[in-house]
């Protein structure tokens, strides 16, 4: 049983490439295909423009994106809320990888060499905030 709240009525799990597009739109707001395409190319090896265009069209059909066609350049925006999508994905991850146990996830994170002293301090502060509630 997971401790994460899931919004199963609107639960949609984007693919890795769909998440890449959503991340750009969440970070920069409504954008043209060209802008999203350029940002994706900054993040990884060359992506073909027509592939980005087709992906965003499919995401619109799935209800993940909205398209403003009022000007010559179509502007896309994310319909899915970042917090909900990431919460759903995190819940699924914890369920499948850590038997629904957030504490098992935290133990794995804290035992990881990638966790810096600064990040550990942030975690301690978060735990203090949770304890004081």
Regions found by a protein language model. Give the residues of each.
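Short capping segments at the starts of secondary-structure elements
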Residues: 14, 24-32
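Short helix-coil junctions and helix-kink-helix linkers
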Residues: 39-47
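Pre-recognition alpha-helix immediately N-terminal to the DNA-recognition helix
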Residues: 19-23
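Short, hydrophobic-biased segments on the C-terminal half of alpha helices
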Residues: 53-57
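Short acidic, hydrophobic short linear motifs in intrinsically disordered regions
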Residues: 31-40
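Amphipathic alpha-helical dimerization/coiled-coil segments
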Residues: 89-131
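Short, cationic-aromatic polyanion-contact patches
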Residues: 15, 70-89
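Glycine-centered, phosphate/nucleic-acid-interacting loop/turn motifs that mediate DNA/RNA or nucleotide
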Residues: 63
């Amino acid at each position: 049983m997971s401790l994460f709240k899931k919004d199963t009525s609107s639960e949609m799990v984007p693919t890795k490439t769909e998440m890449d597009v959503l991340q750009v739109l969440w970070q920069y707001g409504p954008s043209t295909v060209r802008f999203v395409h350029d940002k994706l190319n900054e993040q990884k090896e060359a992506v073909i423009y027509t592939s980005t265009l087709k992906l965003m069209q499919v995401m619109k059909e799935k209800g993940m994106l909205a398209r403003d066609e009022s000007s010559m350049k179509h502007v896309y925006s994310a319909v899915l809320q970042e917090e909900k999508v990431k919460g759903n994905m995190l819940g699924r991850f914890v369920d499948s990888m850590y038997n629904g146990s957030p504490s098992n996830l935290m133990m794995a994170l804290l035992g990881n060499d990638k966790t810096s002293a600064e990040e550990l301090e942030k975690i301690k502060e978060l735990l203090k905030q949770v304890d004081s509630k």
